[in-house]
């Protein structure tokens, strides 16, 4: 089962669109679920995601126009409970102790958060944490040179194989990270 994880598009305020090389990789009919950390900013970005998969889950970012998106969400995909939050609520941004607290509050196997615009994936106390970064490479308050990235999770029974796609220069680099539920 393929799950696309992305966020912080900031279209059209900070970027015009997804990188063309990412659009070529993201084709309709291949992905079953989309988990988005927010800051899509417009309905057009949401409509684009709906063309890729029927099951789209979005949480509200601090720049989203649509106030109907929830602040947080817990989704079950296969054997995994996945928590989804934008991340502007985590202080300081990306703080491990704050993320671990949220993971325990949500009681999830995987916690997905964004806001920092920087990709991260790691295991902590037998739980898995993912920050997909910014799919467009949009700048943030602290940095202008952001590497565009998104994540594809391949969920098979009690294992998640995470593929990280990063646009470095003109090349899409892919890294593979495996997490087994204990």
From Swiss-Prot:
Sequence similarity: Belongs to the VPS29 family.
Q: Which GO molecular-function terms appear in the entry?
A: metal ion binding
Read off the lineage from the record.
Eukaryota, Metazoa, Chordata, Craniata, Vertebrata
What is the protein name for this chain?
Vacuolar protein sorting-associated protein 29
Q: What is the effect of changing residue 91 to S?
A: Disrupts interaction with VPS35
What quaternary structure, including any partners, is listed in this protein's UniProt entry?
Answer: Component of the commander complex consisting of the CCC subcomplex and the retriever subcomplex. Component of the heterotrimeric retriever complex formed by VPS26C, VPS29 and VPS35L; within the complex interacts with VPS35L. Component of the heterotrimeric retromer cargo-selective complex (CSC), also described as vacuolar protein sorting subcomplex (VPS) formed by VPS26 (VPS26A or VPS26B), VPS29 and VPS35. The CSC has a highly elongated structure with VPS26 and VPS29 binding independently at opposite distal ends of VPS35 as central platform.
Q: How does it sit in the membrane?
A: Peripheral membrane protein
Q: Does the keyword Zinc apply?
A: yes
> What is a single cellular component term in the Gene Ontology annotation?
cytosol
Q: Which SUPFAM superfamilies match?
A: Metallo-dependent phosphatases
Q: What is the effect of changing residue 152 to E?
A: Disrupts interaction with ANKRD27
Where N6-acetyllysine occurs, the residues are: 50
What Gene3D superfamilies is this protein classified in? 3.60.21.10
> Which Gene Ontology BP annotations are present?
endocytic recycling; Golgi to vacuole transport; protein transport; retrograde transport, endosome to Golgi
Question: What UniProt keywords apply to this chain's record, in alphabetical order?
Answer: Acetylation, Cytoplasm, Endosome, Membrane, Metal-binding, Protein transport, Transport, Zinc
């Amino acid at each position: 089962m393929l799950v696309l994880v992305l966020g912080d598009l900031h279209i059209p305020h900070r970027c015009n669109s997804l990188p063309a090389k990412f659009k070529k990789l993201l084709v309709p009919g291949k992905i079953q679920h989309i988990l988005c950390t927010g800051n899509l900013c417009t309905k057009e970005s949401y409509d684009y995601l709906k063309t890729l998969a029927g099951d789209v889950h979005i949480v509200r970012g601090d720049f989203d126009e649509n106030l109907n998106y929830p602040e947080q969400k817990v989704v079950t995909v296969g054997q995994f409970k996945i928590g989804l939050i934008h991340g502007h609520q985590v202080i300081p941004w990306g703080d491990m102790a704050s993320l671990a607290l949220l993971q325990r509050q949500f009681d999830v196997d995987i916690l997905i958060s964004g806001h920092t615009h920087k990709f991260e994936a790691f295991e902590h106390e037998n739980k898995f944490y993912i920050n997909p970064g910014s799919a467009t490479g949009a700048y943030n308050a602290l940095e202008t040179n952001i590497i565009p990235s998104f994540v594809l999770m391949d969920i098979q029974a009690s294992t998640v194989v995470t593929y990280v796609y990063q646009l470095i220069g003109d090349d899409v680099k892919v890294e593979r990270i495996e997490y087994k539920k204990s």
